[in-house]
Amino acid sequence: MDDESKPPAPDLFEHFARTAEAVAATTKKLKKAAILGEYFATLTHDDLARAARYFAGQPFALSDARTTNVGGSILSAALMNATGANAEQLSVSYTRWGDGGDAAFEVFSAAKLNNLPSLTLVRTESLLARLSATRGKNAKTDLLSETLSRATPLEAKYLVKLLSGDLRIGLREGLVEDAIARAFHQPLTEVAMANMLRGDIGEAAVRARTGRLHDVEMRLFHPLKFMLATPASDLADIARTMPGEFLVEDKFDGIRAQAHVENGRVGIYSRTLDEISARFP
């Protein structure tokens, strides 16, 4: 068996990336969930939490206010620094694939850097935290360039996808919840409830593995995931969906907000779970 076919160590980001490739290769939801579940079972508790968030396209838990603030210009500059590609080459790749991660894979493959897999899930978490704490475009670019210069093409592909906020492998948060439930033989409703109450699919995954889904409670100033409306074509459609009695009311324009209040302290959170208290008097 050559090195290419050997599965990488579970804690490596390369293993995460190969699993993502396998998920992307099938359109069957049950197969996607099975692939994820098999991978999740190989991880430590901490790496399970990290991987669950990353597969949901979340660099940080939804309840975590941090963001990386890494946009397309920083990603492009870092990719060029790491590979020696020029702006035209990167633009051609992006136009061909329409995805930053796929473009990264192409320019990294062309560069033939011969890097070995070395990025771990914990070092990925550290990089994301440092990017969040770093101020200034140049400083962020230098930090990301340093990591990418040691990356394999597959590591670069999925690091760029993660920083973009969407892996684009036919996977949504609900399917990650389903994979967690199947992997650890827990009710999907309890996994989803834990994720909603904590705003952290990583914590929900660890609780599912350790059998601690039942004791999840809401915490003030830790926002809950919002329940979003489901569109209906007409009243008959609503009646079919909700055969019992129901009320209908006008929808008012505005924002969805969540208010947490205790002992004079007020926290207001947006539908993306960001704190927006300072925007209100």
Model-found features: residue ranges?
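N-terminal nucleic-acid-engaging modules of covalent nucleotidyltransferase systems
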Residues: 1-281
